[in-house]
C-alpha cells in the first residue's frame, strides 16, 4: 500500500509541480521571487499576497490552498518578515508562539497549507539507496481547489478515478488471495486514475524561492 501511495504522490508532483504549466500569476508564468525568501529582503507573505490578488483579478476566484516543497516551507518558517508578524503572539510554557501551517494559512487567508515533504528511493531495486524528496524542494504551488468535484465546478485540477472498476473513490484497491498449493497468500494492488490540470489559470507556481 505504501509503495502505491508513493507512486500516486509521485504522479501528483510530476503533474501539478511541472514547470511552465500554470498561468494564474501576475506574469502568466512561474514566479521566481526577486528577493529570495531566505534573504534579509525576502518577504514570502508579500509575494504570495500579490499572486493571490493577481489570480482573483484574472479569474474572479481567490486561491484557497498552497502546497510547499520541504525547503520552501523551511525558508518561510525562518523568514524575518514572517517571524516579525507572529513574534508578539500569545505564548506560555505550554503554548508558545510559533509558526505552523495554520498560522501561515490564517495570515494569507487560505483554507489549507500542505507541506509536501514525502521522501522516496530513486535507485533501482538492489542498488544502494538514493533518497530524495518527491516534490521539488524549493517550489510552492498556490491554487484554487474545489471543495467538491463537479462538471461545472472550477478547480485547478482533478484526480479522476475509475470507480466502477475498482469500487473505490481513491483509485486504489488492495486484494489478498490465498494460494493453498503454495501455502501462501498473494497480495496485489492496482490503481486506476488520471491526474489532470483543468484550469491552468487557477494555479501559480513559485520556483527557486531560496538561494
What would you call each of these model-derived segments?
Residues 31-43, 83-211:
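Sequence/fold signature of self-assembling virion shell proteins
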Residues 68-70, 144-145:
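Short His-Asn-centered micro-motif
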Residues 1-62, 70-92, 208-211:
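Alpha-helical scaffold segments that mediate packing/assembly in large oligomeric complexes
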Residues 65-69, 114-115:
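A structural signal for short, well-ordered beta-strand segments and their strand-loop junctions
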Amino acid at each position: 500500500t505504501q509503495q502505491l501511495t508513493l507512486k500516486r504522490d509521485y504522479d501528483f508532483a510530476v503533474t501539478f509541480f511541472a514547470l511552465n504549466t500554470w498561468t494564474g500569476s501576475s506574469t502568466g508564468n512561474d514566479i521566481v521571487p526577486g528577493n529570495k525568501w531566505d534573504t534579509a529582503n525576502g518577504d514570502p507573505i508579500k509575494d504570495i499576497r500579490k499572486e493571490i490578488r493577481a489570480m482573483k483579478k484574472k479569474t474572479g476566484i481567490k486561491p484557497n490552498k498552497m502546497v510547499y516543497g520541504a525547503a520552501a516551507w523551511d525558508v518561510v518558517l525562518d523568514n524575518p518578515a514572517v517571524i516579525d508578524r507572529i513574534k508578539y503572539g500569545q505564548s506560555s510554557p505550554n503554548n508558545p508562539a510559533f509558526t505552523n501551517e495554520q498560522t501561515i494559512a490564517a495570515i494569507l487567508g487560505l483554507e489549507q497549507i500542505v507541506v509536501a515533504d514525502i521522501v522516496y528511493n530513486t535507485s533501482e531495486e538492489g542498488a544502494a539507496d538514493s533518497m530524495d524528496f518527491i516534490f521539488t524542494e524549493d517550489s510552492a504551488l498556490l491554487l484554487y481547489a474545489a471543495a467538491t468535484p463537479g462538471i461545472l465546478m472550477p478547480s485547478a485540477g482533478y484526480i479522476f478515478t475509475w470507480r466502477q472498476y475498482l469500487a473505490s473513490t481513491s483509485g486504489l484497491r488492495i486484494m489478498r488471495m490465498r494460494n493453498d498449493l503454495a501455502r501462501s497468500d498473494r497480495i496485489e494492488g492496482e490503481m486506476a486514475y488520471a491526474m489532470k490540470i483543468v484550469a491552468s489559470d487557477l494555479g501559480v507556481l513559485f520556483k527557486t524561492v531560496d538561494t
